[in-house]
Amino acid sequence: MGKKEVKKNKNEGDTPHIRTPIVCVLGHVDHGKTSLLDRIRGSSVVAGEAGAITQHIGATIVPIDSIMSMSGGMKNLNISIPGLLFIDTPGHHAFTTLRARGGALADMAIVVVDITEGFQPQTIEAIQILRNCKTPFVVAATKLDRIPGWRSTEKSPFLKSFAAQNERVTLLVETKVYDIVATLAEHGFSSERFDRVSDFARNLAIVPVSAHTGEGIPDLLMVLIGLAQRYMEEALTLTVDGPGSGTVLEVKEEKGLGATIDVILFDGTIRVGDEIAIATTEGVQTTKVRSLLQPRPMQEILVEDRFLRVKEVVAAAGVKVSAPGLDQVIAGSPVRVIGEDPEEVKTSIAKEMTEINVSLSPEGLIIKADTIGALEALCKELTAHEIPVMRAEVGQVSRHDVIEAETIKDPLYRVLIAFNTPVLPDAQDLLKEPAYAEMIQFFSGNVIYHILEDYLEWRNNLKRIMDQKRFEKIIFPAKILVLPGCVFRQNNPAVVGVRILSGTLRTGVNLVRRDGKKAGTLKSMQLRKENIQEAHAGDEVAISIEGATVGRQFDVEDELLVGIPERHVKVLETEMLSHLNEDAKEVLNEYTRLFRKENPFWGK
């Protein structure tokens, strides 16, 4: 692919422009995504994050000059890529959809893997997302300095540090890298350590790095720039004067500016004075750009009050937009500069906003979230746990939400979940009323997987209680033997000694013969002259049977079965079979065969 000549005057019409490649960072929780970016940008935003997990996308521009100063081996290369723009996508797999948005938005990605732990469920999910989005990626094998015996050299390229290690350490590093290679191969990816890759189009590069010491970071940046320069230059070429398109990361109040929106601009140009279309809680609106504030190079867009006022911004970049009427803009929504067809732009945004990727059910949970991405992510996580969602909306929890949740029939789904969104005062009052507090379970928080864990724990406990109550009502299979020499009374009621051959015998059940005919109703049981309610396989007990005469309905040494109603048989075979041991299952099969001779569908 030949390099295109790029003119530096961005004000000329139809001037080709190589935009900054957008890079997303994905991986398992706590494997070091944010720490890696901290090392690259020389700042720290970890401490203020909920649960130490990034909850909103951030953006960092790393200019090519900074990258070249870190990666000495690139100084003699003719680099046309202006730098790298990193999106710090949330780390936990509960944010699948938001990460997928990042993947679709990004030109390339870094998948972070703790070299000491290897692939985890979220890591595997990350590579699947990137495969689905057709986004090329590099694997950063982080925490290199935690390899036992590793001797660190601050900010050193990997190969230089690697050469200084003893044989035992180098062998351990090789083993850890090839563990990653093997896991990637299991998922259909060919990979190798970056310095051994001859064809980056066919093989994934694995770059061992340490965010703590900076080792390997120059190599990682060099591989990213090399990939973009070699394989993406044509795709990254755009017309400067095209109308800008971006995604709203966050709505923020800024002193002296009022409500502003942080935007990742991924196409075209946005200028002061442009009319833009935005998605708000009141629908698609238009407004005029009052000012543009771009982060200074090497600054994170989440760190406030460090912005440059600019007249225009060219993709790709993180930019703060100040304009009237931004306070109701929905985070995660598209923003477009209006060109020749304003209605087409507004219709396009409206369509995108209504096509939220959420599967709803006639009955299920009600969830509210602060952003579209968070809403989709929460719904996806619930769906993965086979939890239906009845209603999912962006916005605050209202009185109407509480009232609607109370009407849900299934107590397991009579739940209201709020992710990172406030509860309106009248809704708070309603949730405190005893009638609603007893009926509705409310969960809220700013870390999705914590909310999910709390819900699952509550649901499992409630389900256990409900199952226990249900089990108490279900008649379980059992088989008994009438013992010889143990007829204590012939009838009214018959009292005999029996041995439970299998299953659990409870009072109040009907007994049937092996030909299916009724033998009477078990009214009471005694074990060692003590009244009991149930007996188990191997027990020998005395039982009283109403409606039976020994020698007529049954006799000694007869085997009797517990009579199970047809509707109970269906529940036992479809829902409770795992709770039965093999002997009880055999008795159930023996019992159902009696009735399925005439009707094969009995109890099904």
Swiss-Prot record:
Q: So which domain of life are we looking at?
A: Archaea
The segments labelled G4 in the record are 142-145
Annotated region described as G3, given as residue ranges = 88-91
Question: What PROSITE patterns does this protein's entry cite?
Answer: G_TR_2
Output the Pfam families linked to this UniProt entry: GTP_EFTU (PF00009), GTP_EFTU_D2 (PF03144), GTP_EFTU_D4 (PF14578), IF-2 (PF11987)
Q: Which stretches does the entry tag as region G5?
A: 210-212
Example of a GO cellular component annotation carried by this entry:
cytoplasm
Segments for region (G1)? 27-34
Any stretches that span the bilayer, and where are they? none
Which GO molecular function entries does the Swiss-Prot or TrEMBL record give? GTP binding; GTPase activity; translation initiation factor activity
- Where GTP is bound, by residue? 27-34, 88-92, 142-145
**Keyword list, A-Z:** GTP-binding, Initiation factor, Nucleotide-binding, Protein biosynthesis
Q: What residue spans carry the region label G2? A: 52-56
Q: What does this protein do?
A: Function in general translation initiation by promoting the binding of the formylmethionine-tRNA to ribosomes. Seems to function along with eIF-2.
Similarity-based family = Belongs to the TRAFAC class translation factor GTPase superfamily. Classic translation factor GTPase family. IF-2 subfamily.
Protein name (Swiss-Prot/TrEMBL): Probable translation initiation factor IF-2
- Native species: Methanospirillum hungatei JF-1 (strain ATCC 27890 / DSM 864 / NBRC 100397 / JF-1)
